[in-house]
Regions:
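Asp-box/BNR beta-propeller blade signature and adjacent active/binding-site loops
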Residues: 107-434
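Compositionally biased, intrinsically disordered low-complexity regions enriched in proline and serine
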Residues: 7, 30, 51, 59, ...
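N- and C-terminal low-complexity/disordered segments
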Residues: 19-108
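Positively charged n-region of N-terminal signal peptides that target proteins for export
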Residues: 1-5
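Bacterial N-terminal signal peptides
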Residues: 7-15
Length: 434
């Protein structure tokens, strides 16, 4: 009896020492680090045991209890955007058993979450874009060993009739006629009315030295034209989608980054009335220092009034308005919405509401949030797609398709492209918390 008691106490002491046990909580549980290797093993086991098709996104809370091994009580989020409270028993032999799984329903506005691919032929991806074509959805991103490396190419995937996504296809690269090679950047897909699909992207060593190129597809992204270099001083949409105005003009939101120190970041707009054959552009709309702004998105405020919002160096989302369909623009200003110097995107819905997808933080690229506005001035919080400390969920793209649903893609930890479908009719709001 004494021997049994001694062994039990010894095991208890070893477990406490090895797992950094904190003061006991109710039920004999103690707090555990969500980054602890055994906690993560238990969480991954729980997800696969519950549904082999799911993957663990992150653990948000962890407790542990030493009872003939260790019980881990975990709060976690899975790849279908659902949360769960689980208990996993790690036995004395080191194996795991899932003893409890309690799903917490995802927000009813989130209809689908998925990855465009499981694994790709590149270590990193970034800068997604998505568009609806007459034959279905098409998405693109850049991928390679790392951003800025010469092997970074533009990849395209199409949603097939069965809802699955085609394998990503290398569609553009930075190989030059003399054999040299530059990285590609920031693809932007756009479907003009009654015209071929357009793929804009940048080629060059850096944002201050790159140039714009354009490819088109007459079959919904299956095949593509040769690359066309845009005219000197024209870059196409720098990150976010263009809009087609009532007169048929395509208005591209763009920006410039100088190679000075500090770099001046300034926005402007380009316009084509003939599908990219000829172009005009505004001048830079501000000095790029007091407010350093890039990567605008365009919203429709009614009539010829437009608004652009986007990324800054000043930890706030910028805004600027036009009263004449983008020919001239007012003064740029900062909103109350935080921005960690990371890309955003926005769209005006068919019902007139505006959606902004962005990182609601002044630092880091998590969480990833959706905000709603009726007038482009007052914003309310709606959804949180991702919220994992010290991870990256960034550079989103957002569109509304003809069926009224909202489609979103974004960089998931620089490893995958994530696609989320939202029903805007089911969105609820609450005050923003800064």
């Amino acid at each position: 009896m004494k021997t049994t008691l001694f062994l039990t106490l010894a095991l208890f002491a070893i477990a406490l020492a090895s797992h950094g046990q904190q003061p006991p909580l109710a039920g004999g549980f103690s707090q555990a680090a969500i980054t602890d290797a055994e906690v993560l093993k238990a969480a991954q086991f729980a997800v696969k045991a519950h549904d082999a098709k799911l993957t663990l996104q992150y653990v948000t809370a962890a407790e542990q209890q030493v009872v003939a091994g260790i019980n881990f009580k975990l709060k976690l989020t899975t790849s279908d955007a659902r949360k769960a409270d689980v208990i996993v028993w790690r036995k004395l032999d080191g194996s795991f058993e899932l003893t409890s799984w309690q799903s917490i329903a995802a927000d009813p506005a989130i209809l689908t979450t998925e990855y465009i691919y499981d694994t790709g032929p590149y270590p990193q991806i970034h800068a997604t874009t998505i568009v609806e074509t007459p034959t279905g959805l098409v998405t693109a991103w850049f991928g390679g060993t790392a951003e800025k490396n010469p092997d970074v190419c533009i990849w395209v995937s199409r949603q097939l009739p069965d809802g699955q996504w085609s394998e990503g296809v290398e569609t553009a690269n930075g190989v030059q006629p003399d054999g040299s090679r530059h990285p590609t950047w920031n693809p932007v897909l756009f479907q003009p009315k009654d015209a071929p699909l357009m793929l804009f992207y940048k080629v060059g060593p850096s944002p201050s030295t790159w140039w714009g190129e354009l490819k088109t597809s007459a079959d919904g992204g299956k095949t593509w034209s040769a690359a066309q270099k845009l005219p000197q001083g024209i870059f196409g949409p720098i990150k976010n989608k263009p809009v087609q105005l009532a007169n048929g003009d395509i208005l591209c939101p763009t920006s410039n980054e100088t190679d000075t120190k500090p770099s001046a970041w300034a926005i402007y707009f380009e316009r084509t009335a003939d599908l990219g054959k000829t172009w005009t552009r505004t001048e830079l709309l501000h000095d790029g220092f007091k407010i350093g702004a890039i990567q605008p998105s365009i919203l429709f405020l009614g009539g010829d009034k437009l608004q652009a919002v986007g990324r800054t160096k000043q930890t706030k989302v910028f805004q600027i308005t036009s009263e004449d369909a983008g020919k001239t623009w007012g003064e740029i200003s900062l909103t109350d919405l935080p921005n960690p110097n990371s890309g955003t995107d926005a769209v005006t819905l068919a019902d007139g509401r505006h959606l902004l997808i962005y990182n609601h933080t002044a630092k880091g690229r998590s969480p990833l949030n959706l905000a709603i506005s009726k007038d482009g001035k007052t914003w309310e919080a709606s959804l949180v797609f991702e919220d994992e400390p010290k991870k990256e969920f960034s550079y989103p793209a957002i569109i509304q398709t003809k069926d009224g649903l909202v489609h979103i893609t974004y960089t998931w930890k620089r490893a995958k492209v994530k696609h989320v479908v939202v029903d805007p009719a089911k969105l609820t709001t609450k005050p923003l918390m800064n």
